[in-house]
């Protein structure tokens, strides 16, 4: 895999924006309400990907027992806690100290031992069996360097899972014009010009020595809400493994 630069990919303005949301991150009716609706959809994909990659524990309540997981851009721990419940030894990393503090507080209240760090993934050491980063790459200063840093943290037989909005007319309408315009997502959360299409993300993964596996869209319908789909035009989630 490509060796990542130690140059930071953190955007201080983005970190500050998300840090302001830390206090009610775990409130399903607060500023992160959309994440609470999105998280179960992500988890369905993540569980299927885990079962496909490590079939020995398929169907188990704790398929990640004995494995390490790193969630990059973890916020207040909305994904870290389910990964811990699946048995993983979890580390969560975020650029906003407010998020790390909120994550630590919630994990302690939930009786979960999760290692949270306010850090840049490019400056970390060690490797992990599972590396996840949900809706983060569109907020960094250098997507290629960010992917390379994630790849450096991935164990040779590990699994990476990424999700990000697609840069389409539909995503601009749904996520910025409508969702941010109506207050369903805090204003300023997204910069549509920084969204990556699958055709743009693929060569970044390949340059970092990774091969794409499963790819699904996350779509929305009035009847079904957010759900996994073959339609990648709004948001997509994928797996990658060392080539």
Across the structure, where does each feature detected by a protein language model lie?
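Short alpha-helix
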Residues: 193-209, 215
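N-terminal, positively charged/glycine-rich alpha-helical extensions of SAM-dependent methyltransferases
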Residues: 1-32, 40
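Short, flexible, mixed-charge acidic loops at enzyme active sites
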Residues: 171-181
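Conserved alpha-helix/loop element of class I SAM-dependent methyltransferases that forms part
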Residues: 37-65
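Conserved hydrophobic residues forming the short capping helix/wall of the S-adenosyl-L-methionine
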Residues: 50, 54, 107, 205
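Conserved SAM-binding loop
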Residues: 56-62, 67-170, 198, 238-242
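Core SAM-dependent methyltransferase catalytic element
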Residues: 226-243
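Acceptor-substrate binding/catalytic loop of class I
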Residues: 164, 183-200
């Amino acid at each position: 895999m490509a060796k990542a630069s130690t140059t930071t990919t953190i955007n201080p303005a983005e970190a500050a924006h998300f840090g302001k949301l830390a206090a009610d991150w775990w409130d399903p009716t607060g500023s992160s309400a959309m994440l609470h609706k999105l998280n179960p959809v992500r988890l369905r994909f993540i569980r299927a990907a885990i079962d496909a990659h490590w079939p020995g524990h398929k169907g188990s309540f704790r398929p990640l027992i004995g494995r390490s997981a790193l969630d990059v851009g973890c916020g207040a721990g909305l994904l870290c806690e389910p990964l811990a419940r699946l048995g993983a030894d979890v580390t969560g990393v975020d650029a906003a100290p407010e998020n790390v503090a909120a994550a630590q507080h919630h994990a302690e209240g939930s009786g979960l031992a999760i290692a949270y760090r306010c850090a840049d993934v490019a400056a970390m050491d060690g490797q992990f069996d599972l590396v996840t980063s949900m809706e983060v790459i569109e907020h960094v200063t250098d997507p290629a360097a960010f992917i390379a840093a994630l790849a450096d943290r991935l164990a040779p037989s590990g699994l990476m899972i990424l999700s990000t909005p697609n840069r389409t007319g539909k995503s601009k309408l749904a996520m910025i014009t409508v969702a941010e315009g109506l207050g369903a997502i805090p204003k300023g959360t997204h910069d549509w010009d920084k969204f990556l299409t699958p055709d743009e993300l693929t060569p970044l993964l390949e340059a970092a020595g990774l091969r794409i596996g499963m790819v699904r869209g996350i779509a929305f319908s009035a009847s079904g809400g957010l759900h996994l789909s073959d339609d990648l035009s709004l948001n997509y989630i994928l797996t990658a493994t060392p080539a």
